[in-house]
Amino acid sequence: MASGDVLPRFYTVFLSCVSSNSLLIPRSYYEHLPRRLPKTAILTGTGGRVWKVAMMSKREQVYLARGWENFVADNELKDGEFLTFVFDGYKSYEVSIYGRGSCKETRAVVHVEEISDESESDNDSLGSLVDVTPMPAEENSDDTEGDNDSCDSVVDVTPMPVEEISDASDSDYY
């Protein structure tokens, strides 16, 4: 995509009775894309977590399939929540979740803690280790009571690298 292009996007309302195991991608969205959709997509949530999800074509419709149920569980999606998907033009979607109160929510946050070893010498060239652990959703609410600005324990994590489109074969796309 050219740098001035607007990234393709769509939205949906989550309903567990139809979207817990797979999510139908609107035909009006994918029919107008300049490229075919990949068979595997990378979903990046607002909390920094990343999910690999299979895209499946069935009866001339495209779904987010295998792996979608992990996204649903990790983000504790509830009926009536609004999801937006912004496609990078290759394989990745940035997914935002809007709760029933119409506000964007941060879920499935990646929690980073620095682990120091007391026995390490100050001259140790390896430095300290970092533990990256997902935080449970109830610990990462956007509650502003008390205005606790301790942002040092939660950080954005760069999404995992995705192979370039030029490296993909035609069988990787619909």
Curated annotation (Swiss-Prot):
InterPro entries in the record: B3_DNA-bd, DNA-bd_pseudobarrel_sf, Plant_B3_domain
Start-end of DNA-binding region: 8-101
Gene3D superfamilies referenced in this protein's UniProt entry, alphabetically: DNA-binding pseudobarrel domain
CDD domains: B3_DNA
Family annotation (Pfam families): B3 (PF02362)
Keywords, ordered alphabetically: DNA-binding, Nucleus, Transcription, Transcription regulation
Residue segments, region Disordered: 114-174
One function term, GO molecular function aspect: DNA binding
Start-end of Acidic residues biased regions: 139-150, 164-174
Record-level GO cellular component terms: nucleus
Protein's UniProt name: B3 domain-containing protein At3g06220
Lineage of origin: Eukaryota, Viridiplantae, Streptophyta, Embryophyta, Tracheophyta
